[in-house]
């Protein structure tokens, strides 16, 4: 699933996380998808497993790339805000509101960066399941 066309709201971490949750649906349902679309040996002749695996591969690649873009875009945006707040803070060391805002943005940035680790785990799990069921039906291109 691609990111919504209206853009991503990186300002609210809860909205950012909810978007990722929705975007991870394909990974959450991969076992069910494979069980219902890729035949076992006894039903091998009734469904084109290579085409099904190819389509699932392409969907996974698109979903993973899309989420990676969203996460990295939000990290870049939040990093920019943190940098700006740091510069303002250096000019006005007595402003406690500014300090509080800086800390809040730094925390949000750390959470967003941790989503990259979550993404790696989610992707690894999906590829493991995909390869277990599709390796005999479909060979992904070597360049990816």
From Swiss-Prot:
InterPro entries in alphabetical order: MIX23 (IPR019171)
Coiled-coil residue spans: 82-120
Keywords, ordered alphabetically: Acetylation, Coiled coil
Any one of the GO CC terms: mitochondrial intermembrane space
Residues annotated with N-acetylalanine modification: 2
List of residues that carry N6-acetyllysine: 100
Keyword Coiled coil: yes
Domain of life: Eukaryota
Family statement drawn from the similarity comment of this UniProt entry: Belongs to the MIX23 family.
Name of the featured protein: Protein MIX23
């Amino acid at each position: 699933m691609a990111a919504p066309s209206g853009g991503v709201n990186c300002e609210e971490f809860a909205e950012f996380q909810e978007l990722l949750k929705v975007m991870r649906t394909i990974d959450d349902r991969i076992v069910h998808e494979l069980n219902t679309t890729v035949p076992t040996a006894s039903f091998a002749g009734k469904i084109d497993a290579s085409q099904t695996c190819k389509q699932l591969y392409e969907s996974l690649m698109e979903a993973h790339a899309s989420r990676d873009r969203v996460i990295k875009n939000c990290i870049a945006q939040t990093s920019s805000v943190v940098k700006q707040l740091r510069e303002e803070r250096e000019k006005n060391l007595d402003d406690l509101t500014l300090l509080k805002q800086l800390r809040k943005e730094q925390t949000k940035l750390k959470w967003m960066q941790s989503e990259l680790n979550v993404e790696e785990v989610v992707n690894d799990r999906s590829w493991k399941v995909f390869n277990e069921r599709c390796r005999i039906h479909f060979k992904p291109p070597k360049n990816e």
